[in-house]
Curated annotation (Swiss-Prot):
Keywords: ATP-binding, DNA damage, DNA repair, DNA-binding, Nucleotide-binding. It holds the Pfam family MutS_I. GO terms for molecular function: ATP binding; ATP-dependent DNA damage sensor activity; damaged DNA binding; mismatched DNA binding. The gene is mutS. GO terms for biological process: mismatch repair. NCBIfam families: mutS1 (TIGR01070), PRK05399.1 (NF003810). Belongs to the DNA mismatch repair MutS family. This is DNA mismatch repair protein MutS. GO terms for cellular component: cytosol. ATP binds at G589, P590, N591, M592, S593, G594, K595, S596. Gene3D superfamilies: 1.10.1420.10, DNA repair protein MutS, domain I, MutS, connector domain, P-loop containing nucleotide triphosphate hydrolases. This protein is involved in the repair of mismatches in DNA. It is possible that it carries out the mismatch recognition step. This protein has a weak ATPase activity.
Length: 793
């Protein structure tokens, strides 16, 4: 195949982006060649053609984002190569450059994103310590976490629902195994070596300004270098890194996030969906962050609660505030798109509309005394009003973006175009008079431009200044110096309008960039205002109460599960009292009775209080917990090659390693993944260790042997779920009371589940026979005892 200059250019650029699909702009299309073309054709279901024996597939430039989204979702990295000069102005080969590398974690376009964060994670490891830097390129948020605990790192990666992992080569295979559905890319070590990247990105004189460890600084440097590589720019929109530290926030492992159904996942209804009545995208993202990182500082928690209480107490102003917030747009992402030169005219309209709301919001804020006055750039509002159409059509350069009156020069060119048809009509009339040809017609087509058309019957009347341009079957087409001059002016006006709109739009965007810091601070303040007002709205809507904090007392009166109550009629409220003297609760009772719901609701009420929310209870006095741990349910870990029981023991090992006297531990059926004897022994030993540890524990179990703990340890109290029997019917009241379950009601639960009557009747026969045999052998007559006791009474 003969290599043309164009193909040489393509191959040279492709060499620099071997690991990406290269979309190469050719006129009105982005073309892919060779293997890239085959992939594009298959993924996008478009025709594969050939150009000089090279496989080729193309997509229209105006539909790029639609096709790009499909390629990225299919797991491909895509390099966009654009024409850097107008074809009409270049007689040589057009200069082309890659302007963007698109990966799942580097997307900023609105149509690609949901309201939630789109996190990329850069992961590094050095001498047994792990560092993860999370970045949402679309908002500029940067979070840093460092730990010597590999599982804690994996938990955070799972909790943040990351879209992309970037890591050192030696971590790539293990991370791919753990997160098979996440796009994972390895980078060379030199990404981690240039700490000057941090200084330049944040304009720092001293790199230690952030108080990050050497490993964290290296990982942050790698993130910065990678974002520069994908966005093809030195000017980044990155906020100062926020350290995820146990000193400030409760660290939640992924099991707890999943077991308590905190955020959307595989388990359907969740706490975030219940609480998320936010009015802004920024607020929704912040609420999710608060749920994943509850506070551990009592003063900070109480400040949030006080703000929520003030909002609850002024419902009229609260409603007004939320009405205004509902018109606030995603300022955070708009600023990011402007910074990366990816904004569209509607972004600037949305920004203006948001800024116009701020004075009205400030009036309402003065009623509360909770929030500071919102600062915003008034001069920018004025500029956006004058510059950008209220309803811009198309992109800059298409003549419908910049307002009339903003640029007198642009208005002149527009006037010329708008009156072109009128002037052509005048010219046509003048030529008809001059030539005496009444059927003379002035027209235009894209190939020949403007022309005068005369039928062949009238050719003897044409003046000397008519220059033949095209011959048709029944007529001839001509041009005159005057018409040629008019055409030149029109073409120049069209070109100049396109250039000027692009230039003016860019200049307005540059003005927006100058106000970046103020706009990002405004976005932060609006998000916080939205979350606090949402928590107040939730408190009113769901009848929540303000929690009070105590050093060691956990007292909940009329507690409810915030998620289950939303989807259940007549939810049964329950009480719990724990302190340092009585801090370990063993809960027995049959399946379906509500044991799991009860212990989860205690965890959720505690967590909600620590994000600054009112809670579903009549009264709540709570300690501030440093961690909430859960071990619930039976599940295996196929990706990690772990059985159900091994997963259970791994999670218990984490709890025994990390829990303190300030932790809340929620256990459901620990020890059920092995034999009964082994299970009871392990559960008893774990209970002893947790009692010594001093943490507050709620342990739901079918092992009635564990109720004997109360006789050995004064810290233990037994609870059960009240069950009523009416004839052959069993009623689960879901009410937690003092005491021990006297039977399991397993057959009754099977009956409720729809097991056929013949199977149920046979189960009763077997149960009766087994207990007769057991009574003869042991001399005991407790027909309903669930287990043979292992420990002496």
């Amino acid at each position: 195949m003969k290599v043309t200059p164009l193909m040489e250019q393509y191959l040279r650029i492709k060499e620099q982006y071997k690991d990406s699909i290269l979309l190469f702009r050719l006129g009105d299309f982005y073309e892919a060649f060779f293997e890239d073309a085959k992939i594009v054709s298959k993924v996008l279901n478009i025709v594969l053609t050939r150009r000089q024996d090279a496989p080729m597939a193309g997509i229209p430039y105006h539909a790029l984002n639609t096709y790009l989204k499909k390629l990225v979702e299919a797991g491909y990295k895509v390099a966009i190569c654009d024409q850097m000069e107008e074809p009409s102005k270049s007689k040589k080969l057009i200069r082309r450059e890659v302007t963007r590398v698109v990966t799942p974690g580097s997307i900023v376009e609105d149509e690609f994103l949901s309201e939630t964060n789109n996190y990329m994670a850069v992961v590094s490891e050095e001498k047994g310590r792990y560092c993860t830097v999370f970045c949402d390129v679309s908002t500029g948020e940067v979070l840093v976490h460092e730990s010597s605990d590999e599982q804690e790192t994996l938990d955070l990666l799972k909790n943040y629902s990351i879209s992309q992992i970037v890591c050192s080569e030696h971590l790539k295979s293990s991370l791919r195994e753990r997160f098979p559905g996440v796009y994972t890319e390895s980078i060379s070590e030199w990404y981690f070596s240039d700490l000057e990247e941090v200084e330049k990105a944040y304009n720092l004189k001293d790199i230690h300004h952030f108080e990050l460890s050497p490993l964290a600084l290296k990982t942050l440097a790698a993130l910065i270098k990678y974002v520069k590589y994908t966005m093809i720019t030195e000017d980044l929109n990155l906020k100062p890194p926020l350290l995820i530290s146990q000193r400030d926030y409760m660290i939640l492992d992924s099991a707890t996030v999943e077991n308590l159904s905190l955020i959307p996942g595989d388990r359907g209804k969740n706490l975030f969906d219940v609480l998320n009545n936010t009015e802004t995208p920024m607020g929704a993202r912040l609420l999710k962050k608060w749920i994943l990182h509850p506070l551990v500082d009592r003063k900070q928690i109480e400040e949030r609660l006080e703000a929520v209480e003030r909002l609850v107490n002024d419902r009229v102003s609260l409603e007004e505030m939320r009405n205004f917030l509902s018109n606030v747009r995603d300022v955070e992402r708009i600023v990011s798109r402007v910074e990366y030169n990816r904004s569209v005219p509607r972004d600037l309209v949305a920004l203006r509309e948001t800024l116009e709301i701020i004075p009205k919001l400030n009036e309402i804020l003065s009623n509360f005394g909770v929030f500071n006055k919102l600062a915003f750039p008034e001069e920018l509002v004025d500029l956006l009003r004058r510059a950008i159409e209220d309803d811009p059509l198309g992109s800059p350069g298409e003549g419908k973006v910049i307002k009339r009156g903003f640029s007198p020069e642009l208005d002149e060119y527009r006037d010329l175009l708008e009156h072109a048809e009128e002037r052509l009509k005048e010219f046509e009339e003048k030529e008809r008079e001059r030539t005496g040809i009444q059927k003379l017609r002035v027209g235009y087509n894209q190939v020949f431009g403007y022309y005068i058309e005369v039928t062949k019957a009238n050719l003897d009347k044409i003046p000397d200044d008519y220059e033949r341009k095209q011959t048709l079957v029944n007529s001839e087409r001509f041009i005159t110096p005057e018409l040629k001059e008019f055409e030149t002016k029109i073409m120049a006006a069209k070109e100049r309008i396109e250039e000027m709109e692009k230039e003016l739009f860019k200049s307005v965007c540059e003005e927006v960039k100058k106000h970046k810091e103020v706009l990002l601070k405004l976005s932060e303040d609006l998000a916080k205002m939205d979350v606090l007002s949402t928590l107040a709205y939730d408190a009113i809507l769901y009848n929540y109460t303000k929690p009070v904090f105590s050093e060691d007392r956990l007292e909940i009166k009329g507690g409810r599960h915030p998620v289950v109550e939303r989807f259940t009629q007549n939810f049964v409220e329950n009480d719990i009292y724990m302190d340092n003297e009585k801090r370990f609760v063993v809960i027995t009772g049959p399946n379906m009775s509500g044991k799991s719901t009860f212990i989860r609701q205690v965890g959720l009420i505690s967590l909600m209080a620590q994000i600054g929310s009112f809670v579903p209870a009549q009264k709540a006095i709570l300690p501030v917990f440093d961690r909430i741990f859960t071990r619930m349910g039976a599940r295996d870990d196929l990706a990690g090659g772990r059985s159900t029981f091994l997963v259970e023991m791994n999670e218990m090992a984490l709890i025994l390693l990390k829990s303190t006297e300030k932790s809340l531990v929620l256990l459901d059926e620990v020890g059920r993944g092995t034999s009964t004897q082994d299970g009871v022994s392990i559960a008893w030993a774990i209970s002893e260790e947790l009692i010594k540890r001093g943490c507050k524990v709620l342990f739901a179990t079918h092992f009635t042997e564990l109720t004997e703990l109360e006789k050995h340890f004064p810290q233990v109290q037994n609870k059960t779920i009240l069950v009523k029997e009416e004839g052959k019917n069993v009623i689960f009241t879901h009410k937690v009371v003092d005491g021990v379950a006297d039977r399991s009601y397993g057959i009754e639960v099977a009956k409720i589940a729809g097991i056929p009557d013949r199977v149920i009747n046979r189960a009763y026969e077997i149960l009766e026979r087994n207990f007769k045999n057991h009574t003869k052998k042991n001399g005991k007559s407790n027909r309903f005892s669930q287990q043979i006791p292992l420990f002496p009474v």
